[in-house]
Amino acid sequence: MRQIIITIYEIYLDRLTIVAEQLHREGLVIIHVYEFGVIIGMAEEKVILRIRNHKEVASLVEDKQVHIPPPDSEVQ
């Protein structure tokens, strides 16, 4: 599963709970829903492809993890 960040179009913010429920039924595991239109969740690749096609979804990006070594570590 991949962690994703979904942004919902502003015109659908009054239906945010309904949109989140629809995405959950599609297979999204919801971690958090922010009232300003951002949904954080986890989904398999095939679910991500389906979610991208929802008219309410303005953007969908994968949350990337970056690991930075401590300042005193050796350069690789």
Feature annotation, model-predicted:
Residues R25-I31:
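Short secondary-structure junctions
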Residues H32-Q76:
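Autoinhibitory propeptides
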